[in-house]
Every structure is written in C-alpha cells, then in structure tokens.
Amino acid sequence: MARKDRMSGNEAVSFAIRQINPDVMPAFPITPSTEIPQMVSTYIANGEIDTEFVPVESEHSAMSAAIGSEAAGARTLTATSSAGLALMWEELLLAASNLMPIALALVNRTLSGPININCDHSDGMGARDTGWIQIYAENNQEAYDNFIQAYPIAESAGVHLPIMICQDGFITSHAVENIELLEDEEVKNFVGEYEPEEFLLNPGKPIAVGPYSVTSYAMEAKKNQEIALENAKDAVLKVAKEFKKISGRSYGLFEEYKTKDADYIMLLIGSAAGTAKQAVDDLRAKGKKVGVIKLRLFRPFPADELATALKGAKAVAIMDRTESYNGNGGPLGSEVTAGLFRNKVMIDTVNYIYGLAGRDFTVQEVYDIFADLEDHIENGTKLEQFKYIGLR
C-alpha cells in the first residue's frame, strides 16, 4: 500500500534508489545533485542497501567506472549536473554505443559561462545527441516515479541503452513537496533482478567490450544503436502501462493539459509546466482556448506523436530553457518545427528562450505569450519566430 510523505526531489530519487538497490554507484559530487550520492552512501552505511559505492576523482571517472561495472554485469547508476555531465561527454558516447543500460540521475543546472549554479536545461540538451534516453520530470513525484521506471525501460529487450532521469536543479531537487511512495517490495518486484544478456564475467560466453571498429563495420553498429533508441519509445509506453497498475499514476511520451479544443498551445519541458498550467487555468476561466503540452520523453524524440497532438491548434509556443547558439532557435524549437513540417502540419510556431541560469518564469509571462500568439493569428501582428522572454 502506498504511503504519503514529504520529500525534496533529491530525496525522492535517493529513496527510489534505496528501493531498487542497484549493484554499483560510482559518483563525484557536484551541486545541485550532491545530495543524491550523499543520501545513497548513508543508506549503504546504515545497512539498508548493499550497493557498492565507488568514490572517484571526477565525473569522467564516475562514468568510466559505471561503464566498467555495467560491462561486468552489474546494475549501475550515477548522478551529476552541469559541468559534471560535460566532463563525462566522451564516456556518455561510449556507454550508449556499447548498449549499456546505466541510469543517470541528472539534476539540471546551467553550463558555464558566466559561472552560475542555477537551473536551465543546457546540460541535458547539450548531451541530447549522445545516444542516451532522456526523460524529464515536472515535480518531485515524477522524479521518483521516473527513476523507478528507468531500469525497466533501459534494460528492455531491443533497447539496452543508458537513460537519464532529469529534474530541475533547486526548483525540484531542493524544494520539498508532498509525495506518494510505493512499498519497497512493490518497487523491487516491478524493477526485477538484472539479467544482462552479455557481460564480461561470463566464462561460458567470452565477449569483447568496446573494441576498435573498422570502417567495414562501424556504420552498421551506429545504425543498430539508432534502432535501439527508436525501440525505446515503445518501451517507455509499455513500462508506463505496467507502472500504472502498481501506482495508479499515468505516464506517456508527453502530457496534454486542456489541449482538446485549444487554439493556442504552449509546449515545454520540466517544472515550468506547473506555471504554464496555472496560467492556462486562469485564461480558461476567461474563455480563452489555451492548453499545455509537457514533454516527458525528449530522447527518442516523439515527433510524429507531437505533430498529431498539435495539428488542431492555430499556433504553438515552443519553450526552450536553453540556448543552442545557432541563430535559429533552441533544441526543442528545432525538433518540433522539423517534426511538424515532415508531418505536413502547417501551423504557426514561435520559439521562446526562457529561464536561463535560474531566471524565474512567471504566470504573467505565460499570459503574455498566449496574448502574442492570439494577436498574431487574429490581427496579423508580425512575430519574431525566435525570441527571448523575461530579459531585463
């Protein structure tokens, strides 16, 4: 039977790790994810789990150790943020290309510079093309639920890819909210025992891990990795369906909030969805047909599904909490518009950059964005297709 508690996002993820009891956790601390390895090591010291905690000298070493333990057949995780993820860059690519279902608790924090420790999505989005599955949470409950689903997704047949479970630094990681926890036995049964198909410590079936791949074979290996990432989409939905049976909570590729008859939709990721939903409620009370799509799964990107969800709208605001520095828009803006075009969904889009380096995103700004979209459609007012909101 589920029980109610109050936890920060970091506490919630750490508690999920305690319930899963993975085999190995190499980690190096970095704000705002430091509490996760700290809390897990406390669980270990108290004898609550028997995870092997490996303190290392850097985040590069943390991911290197994670690759080694996963290759040996151990269920493995780590946690990091910002520059820590950037330092893992080389190893992120290796973990994915070797099809290793490592779980990474990513607490999103801006990348320098200027030096800043607050939230935006530049770290996760910077690693978007490394081959990892990426799932984002709006609140502490979702951070907890997503982490419990992480291994069943990553370890699914035909997938076997590493997975990032992302939450917004400080906004959810350190904020305390009411949360509903599953019983330990429920989580243990749901996640199951790890039974890797291939691993180094298997004398009956010797393998090589990460050997040099010549030109004659390397391209096929990359295509197989891409197929595995495509398969992850179905795995996310299948695992979510099973998770609902034990929790009563529904998850998908994204959440649609009051979009059924919406003329104007805001599409975004993470904790800002709560702000957008509040604004939508307020505007709906005034007769405005507006809605929100909160993207949960960013990798693999659900382009076709999003195009279907957006095709009835007159215009969409695509919100990026990061800057791609390409002069053309943020990551979400680029991917959504490409998906709409490929699916022949010709609606107006505006890509907004917001909330960089912890800048607050307000209900009033959501009002303003929807007002801009309506003015553009109803009165023909020209809008920039790529713009910042919330600048001083």
Q: For the regions a protein language model found, what residue spans apply to each?
A:
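Thiamine diphosphate
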Residues: M1-G126, G131-W132, I148, I389-R392
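Short acidic, glycine/serine/threonine-rich loops at helix termini
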Residues: I36-M39, A65-I67, M88-L92, G113-C119, ...
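Short helix-loop-beta junction
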Residues: S41-N46, Q278-V292, F341-R342
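Glycine-rich beta-alpha junction loops
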Residues: R109-T110, Q167-H174, G270, E323, ...
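Conserved thiamine diphosphate
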Residues: N118-P162, C166-G169, V345-R359
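Conformationally flexible catalytic loops at phosphate/diphosphate-handling active centers
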Residues: P162-E255
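Redox- and metal-dependent alpha/beta enzyme cores, enriched for Fe-S-associated oxidoreductases
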Residues: T259-K288, F301-T308
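Peripheral docking tails and interdomain loops at the edges
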Residues: D320-R392
